[in-house]
Amino acid sequence: MSCPVIELTQQLIRRPSLSPDDAGCQALLIERLQAIGFTVERMDFADTQNFWAWRGQGETLAFAGHTDVVPPGDADRWINPPFEPTIRDGMLFGRGAADMKGSLAAMVVAAERFVAQHPNHAGRLAFLITSDEEASAHNGTVKVVEALMARNERLDYCLVGEPSSIEVVGDVVKNGRRGSLTCNLTIHGVQGHVAYPHLADNPVHRAAPFLNELVAIEWDQGNEFFPATSMQIANIQAGTGSNNVIPGELFVQFNFRFSTELTDEMIKAQVLALLEKHQLRYTVEWWLSGQPFLTARGKLVDAVVNAVEHYNEIKPQLLTTGGTSDGRFIARMGAQVVELGPVNATIHKINECVNAADLQLLARMYQRIMEQLVA
């Protein structure tokens, strides 16, 4: 017997939606949602396709996700072409199977089943879908959220379908995320000949004590909801490639994943104070890609935990670990935000796959969440 969740996932995988190209995925989802009475508003910005869809009125539960995927890498290393979905030994292979076309299919099928059983549901059910989450994310969810906030749209609860699970569906639910702050730092020196160091000023030598002190800082100890803030140097570049030239500049890029114990301004102030302490000549640029957010126990978290316990008979861990997601933008609307999706073991990898039975289970969990919050 065919399964509508698997069939829709396969249809989505066949559309090679390399970010920010949607490749027809949203048209497919919109057709399904309009057929069950959703009003759909396309909200495209530049090269990114987005849509906001809703049905009903009142307290609002939105499901959020992205149709775009990362490049598949060397297609010859896949057991099957990455955009030709294949099921082997119960596993559905294809780029986007886990991140996150399987979740999108589960959301839509759950909505179809929910509406069939509750055609006059009490609350409002909504979808916020973008084609740019994996790349810059500049014209995706963040722009939709800004537009919705400008007209005072209501959003009480949001479930993001990112692959949150580790071993089985629902073993981990993300009820928050750390903030992300990147520093692009250039240390200025004076270029010269290595045989005449007194005529130059080596920025690598000057920066070494600063960097040594920077990496030794314990920024905080975290708290009951967040791990300790982490700082990692991601890129470092200097020199001309020649062994007889002292470089004139050193570029260092480092990233903070920070908890609610800190603010981005506190981090910036400490870094700048350290630069001044070491008397460095520098230019600095900051990129704040997301503030930390946390959804405490409440109606949404309780509904998600209930759905997982009902269908998988496990109590999920509530964690805030991992990278950023579009949940950071949606949280600005004051909504409770939680992430629940399939196992993430193969996301962005060659031979990305998801257990087909897990997607069926996920659709049932999503439907039960709808029933608890907007039926």
From Swiss-Prot:
CDD domains according to UniProt: M20_DapE_proteobac
Amino acids binding Zn(2+) 1: H66, D99, E162
GO biological process: diaminopimelate biosynthetic process; L-arginine biosynthetic process; lysine biosynthetic process via diaminopimelate
InterPro entries associated with the record: ArgE/DapE_CS, Bact_exopeptidase_dim_dom, DapE_proteobac, Peptidase_M20, Peptidase_M20_dimer, Peptidase_M20A
Enzyme Commission code(s) on record: 3.5.1.18
Biological or metabolic pathway of the protein: Amino-acid biosynthesis; L-lysine biosynthesis via DAP pathway; LL-2,6-diaminopimelate from (S)-tetrahydrodipicolinate (succinylase route): step 3/3
Keyword Oxidoreductase: no
Cofactor note text: Binds 2 Zn(2+) or Co(2+) ions per subunit.
Reactions catalysed, as given in the entry: N-succinyl-(2S,6S)-2,6-diaminopimelate + H2O = (2S,6S)-2,6-diaminopimelate + succinate
Keyword Flavoprotein recorded: no
Coiled coil stretches, renumbered: none
MF annotations from Gene Ontology: acetylornithine deacetylase activity; cobalt ion binding; succinyl-diaminopimelate desuccinylase activity; zinc ion binding
Taxonomic superkingdom: Bacteria
Active site (catalytic residues): D68, E133 (proton acceptor)
UniProt: Zn(2+) 2 binding residues: D99, E134, H348
SUPFAM superfamilies: Bacterial exopeptidase dimerisation domain (SSF55031), Zn-dependent exopeptidases (SSF53187)
Keyword tags: Amino-acid biosynthesis, Cobalt, Diaminopimelate biosynthesis, Hydrolase, Lysine biosynthesis, Metal-binding, Zinc
Subunit details: Homodimer.
Similarity remark: Belongs to the peptidase M20A family. DapE subfamily.
Protein's job: Catalyzes the hydrolysis of N-succinyl-L,L-diaminopimelic acid (SDAP), forming succinate and LL-2,6-diaminopimelate (DAP), an intermediate involved in the bacterial biosynthesis of lysine and meso-diaminopimelic acid, an essential component of bacterial cell walls.
Protein name: Succinyl-diaminopimelate desuccinylase
The organism of origin for this protein: Escherichia coli O17:K52:H18 (strain UMN026 / ExPEC)
Gene symbol of the encoding locus: dapE
